[in-house]
Amino acid sequence: MPRYKLTVEYDGTPYVGWQRQENGHAVQGAIEQAFKKFCGEDLTLSAAGRTDAGVHATAQVAHVDLAKDWGAGKVRDAVNAHLVMADERISILNVEKTTDTFDARFSARARHYLYRIHNRRAPLAVDYQRAWWVQKQLDADAMHEAAQRLLGEHDFTTFRATQCQAKSPVKTLDRLDVTRNGDMVEMRVSARSFLHNQVRSFAGSLMEVGVGRWTADDLQAALEARDRKACGQVAPPYGLYLVGVDYAFPF
């Protein structure tokens, strides 16, 4: 069976997350339904990141096996046509044939996320449900400086959800940058893999630094506490975007 690698963009607002669920409309289920209308197959997509409800993606990666050897362009255009007809907020940006050794989740070498904070007094209109609205002025430089304390390998128990199913809380953080562009404060974070709610926990805790309630030492103390109760607030899902997944090629 030929295997296809998909690059997917979606607005996470109307979905219960990536993963198909019995109750609620999921991104995975919507794409699988579009495939069924295209080729008549009941199939299962595997993705690099199982994003939560409300989280967006500009470059999610998934793979799927099809019974027939379709052209990659045909797959992209046909599935997109069915997604449009179903009024889904999902776009298949690219499809390419790959080998059966490629796995969107387990072959990934790095995942890249963006968290957007719209920092202004006026409420959001265009960016509503696309960024976290924070009214109090944020010191992005202080946030960035504090964020560097989190780089490297650590036990990130403080920054993971209590229901996280990962076997170990130890992860290696490769990048955590905070920058400001006008009213927009952006946090970019990269690692091979993440714990449940880890990025949103970083964003919420760094916001505490940005408004002056925490110092960089406070953030480090929270990390070293290895206690979920030491975390700042968990930032809302709609500011979070999966923006890239890296792989080692060829397969």
Curated annotation (Swiss-Prot):
Superkingdom to which the source organism belongs: Bacteria
Coiled coil: none
Active site: D52
EC numbers: 5.4.99.12
InterPro entries the UniProt entry points to: PsdUridine_synth_cat_dom_sf, PsdUridine_synth_TruA, PsdUridine_synth_TruA_a/b_dom, PsdUridine_synth_TruA_C, TruA/RsuA/RluB/E/F_N
Binding site for substrate: Y113
Catalytic activity as recorded in UniProt: uridine(38/39/40) in tRNA = pseudouridine(38/39/40) in tRNA
Entry keywords, A to Z: Isomerase, tRNA processing
Gene Ontology MF terms: RNA binding; tRNA pseudouridine(38-40) synthase activity
Gene Ontology BP term (one): tRNA pseudouridine synthesis
Record-linked CDD domains: PseudoU_synth_EcTruA (cd02570)
Pfam families per record: PseudoU_synth_1
Main function: Formation of pseudouridine at positions 38, 39 and 40 in the anticodon stem and loop of transfer RNAs.
Subunit structure: Homodimer.
Family under the similarity heading: Belongs to the tRNA pseudouridine synthase TruA family.
Name of the protein this chain belongs to: tRNA pseudouridine synthase A
Organism name: Brucella canis (strain ATCC 23365 / NCTC 10854 / RM-666)
